[in-house]
């Protein structure tokens, strides 16, 4: 049976007049509860929209689904809900990996856990208001999940490059395609992991990180791929949020295919290829720095190859799983957009057109809002 997948996205809240972020999440969530779909369905706001670490952020999520088309419909619906609630409250929602221009990023959401994170981790937390996309994929057991995490690690930098959507920070070009990835890597529990080898090995590492305070709770074990807390999934956390939901679902399909392929290798008794953490970090840095604009580390050749050929190698490695899930055509059609024109490329093109990072913000907002407006005209088609 095809594994279910779910997608979480984090969005920024902007002042549409200045282009700066604003701590508007309480106002937007209030609008959603009182006047939006949350009130009409008599559902809690957290079912579709939720607060994040800072008040200039919102989180959206889909349900676990088997069909990529259903994931797209839900992802677009969640974006529409967030965007319309933001506009009704006088703001705008935008899908961007990091704050590109400025604004008030200091207001922590009213949550004891979030306040404790800032108290404990200081500047790492205070500058940690980034926006990612997380993909969840079903697993049959913790044993299978750890085997998957051990096997997919070398491929995750390819996803970093495809999803890169955060070149601008503090009104300037960072020089990176995904500056969010570098900011996120500051957390003491974040980043790629060497092989755990077993559930016991995984739990031992988790316990040590918790014991020394590198994470305050299991939800703060920010491995690039981890076993989810409270649900039987592997969660991949390496991607920037992007403006194009079809590309997001395509990346979700690739993650699902990676999980399925790795699980089959484990079930067949094939060992995981060993990678040192230093090599994985170098591959991640390369993907974050250049995105799709230069060479990437090829997980099979273990050397630099043109980014396009590394993406092709990923698709080839998981092609049977993509076909079995009915996702091969989706990937063939949509992946070309991420290869040729990912978020970082679009943001830099917007800067070239407008001559300002404010113009980049306007473009991010416009593309984010178009992502549900365009979908309405051809719903269900990928």
Curated annotation (Swiss-Prot):
InterPro entries attached to this UniProt entry: GCL_type2/YbdK_subfam, GCS2, Gln_synth/guanido_kin_cat_dom, YbdK
Disulfide bonds: none
UniProt keyword rRNA-binding, yes or no: no
Gene3D superfamilies in the record: 3.30.590.20
The UniProt record lists the keyword Acetylation: no
Pfam families: GCS2
Entry EC number(s): 6.3.2.2
GO molecular function per UniProt: ATP binding; glutamate-cysteine ligase activity
Keywords: ATP-binding, Ligase, Nucleotide-binding
Reactions performed catalytically: L-cysteine + L-glutamate + ATP = gamma-L-glutamyl-L-cysteine + ADP + phosphate + H(+)
GO annotation terms (biological process): modified amino acid biosynthetic process
NCBIfam families named among the record's database cross-references: gshA_cyan_rel (TIGR02050), PRK13517.1-1 (NF010041)
Family per similarity comment: Belongs to the glutamate--cysteine ligase type 2 family. YbdK subfamily.
Stated role: ATP-dependent carboxylate-amine ligase which exhibits weak glutamate--cysteine ligase activity.
HAMAP family named among the record's database cross-references: Glu_cys_ligase_2 (MF_01609)
Protein name per Swiss-Prot or TrEMBL: Putative glutamate--cysteine ligase 2-1
Organism (species): Nocardioides sp. (strain ATCC BAA-499 / JS614)
Lineage, highest ranks first: Bacteria, Bacillati, Actinomycetota, Actinomycetes, Propionibacteriales
């Amino acid at each position: 049976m095809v594994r279910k997948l779910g997608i979480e996205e984090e969005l920024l809240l902007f002042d549409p007049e200045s282009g700066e972020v604003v701590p508007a999440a309480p106002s937007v969530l209030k609008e959603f509860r009182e006047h939006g779909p949350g009130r009409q369905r008599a559902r809690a706001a957290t079912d579709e929209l939720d607060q994040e670490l800072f008040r200039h952020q919102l989180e959206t999520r889909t349900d676990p689904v088997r069909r990529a088309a259903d994931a797209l419909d839900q992802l677009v619906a969640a974006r529409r809900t967030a965007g319309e609630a933001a506009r009704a409250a006088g703001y705008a929602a935008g899908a961007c990996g990091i704050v590109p221009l400025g604004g008030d990023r200091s207001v922590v959401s009213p949550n004891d856990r979030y306040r404790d994170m800032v108290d404990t981790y200081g500047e790492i937390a205070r500058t940690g208001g980034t926006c990612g996309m997380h993909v969840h994929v079903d697993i049959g057991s913790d044993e299978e999940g750890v085997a998957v995490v051990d096997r997919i690690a070398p491929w995750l930098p390819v996803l970093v490059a495809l999803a890169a959507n955060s070149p601008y920070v503090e009104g300037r070009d960072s020089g990176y395609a995904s500056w969010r990835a570098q900011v996120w890597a500051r957390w003491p529990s974040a980043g790629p992991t060497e092989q755990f080898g077993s559930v016991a090995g995984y739990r031992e590492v988790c316990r040590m990180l918790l014991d020394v305070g590198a994470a305050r709770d299991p939800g703060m074990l920010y491995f690039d791929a981890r076993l989810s807390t409270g649900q039987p999934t592997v969660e991949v956390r390496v991607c920037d949020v992007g403006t194009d939901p079809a590309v997001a679902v395509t990346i979700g399909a690739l993650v699902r295919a990676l999980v399925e392929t790795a699980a089959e290798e484990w079930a067949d008794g094939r060992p995981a290829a060993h990678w040192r953490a230093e090599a994985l970090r170098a591959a991640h840095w390369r993907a974050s720095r250049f995105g799709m604009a230069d060479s990437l580390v090829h997980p099979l050749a273990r050397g630099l190859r043109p980014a396009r050929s590394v993406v092709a190698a990923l698709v080839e490695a998981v092609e049977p799983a993509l076909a079995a899930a009915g996702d091969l055509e989706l990937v063939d059609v949509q992946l070309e957009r991420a290869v040729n024109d990912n978020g970082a490329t679009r943001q830099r093109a917007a800067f070239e057109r407008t001559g300002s990072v404010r113009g980049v913000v306007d473009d991010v907002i416009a593309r984010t809002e178009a992502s549900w407006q365009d979908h309405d005209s051809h719903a269900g088609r990928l």
